[in-house]
């Protein structure tokens, strides 16, 4: 599907460690890293390719030319779109997709689409298992570093930080 409907609206595209490793291998990661983030919407950290604040659509979508800038190496989620897999069955994740019911699909194309949906599912399961652990390790380390820094501060410096935090809350 290459109509751009999904690409121009989605603000956070799920990505996996497999996507990131492939982009590193293919020399694309440096250009994408500023758009890779962590989404906490579901309660657990998930890797995403996201637009900058205030921008709409996938950051890799060129809305003027209606093209994906990384079409040759797009995220697994995009390769499978609009097909998804949940571990037991395949389903259409976006029934509003303009490509549904348009043209024909042969057995080989269907197999490719199904494989992409399964690859996306498996890669995201792996990433979604590891990201929360890595997030916890990194956040724990940051808290420890902050605590150690606070131990070396004077009472006056600590009071200044508390004042700043109070101002931020108001």
Which positions does each model-derived feature cover?
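Short loop/turn segments that flank or connect secondary-structure elements
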Residues: 1-170
């Amino acid at each position: 599907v290459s109509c751009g409907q999904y690409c121009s609206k989605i603000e956070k595209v799920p990505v996996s460690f497999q996507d990131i490793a492939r982009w590193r291998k293919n020399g694309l990661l440096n250009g994408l890293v500023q758009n890779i983030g962590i989404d906490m919407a579901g309660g657990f950290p998930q890797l995403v390719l996201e637009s900058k604040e205030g921008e709409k659509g996938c950051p890799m979508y060129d809305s003027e030319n209606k093209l994906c800038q990384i079409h040759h190496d797009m995220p697994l989620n995009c390769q499978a779109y609009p097909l998804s897999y949940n571990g037991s069955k395949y389903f259409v994740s976006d029934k509003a997709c303009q490509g549904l019911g348009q043209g024909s699909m042969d057995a080989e194309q269907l197999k490719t689409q199904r494989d992409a949906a399964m690859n996306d599912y498996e890669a995201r399961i792996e990433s979604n298992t590891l990201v929360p652990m890595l997030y916890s390790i990194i956040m724990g380390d940051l808290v420890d570093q902050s605590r150690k820094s606070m131990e070396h501060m004077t009472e006056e410096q600590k009071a200044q930080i508390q004042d700043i935090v109070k101002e931020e809350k108001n």
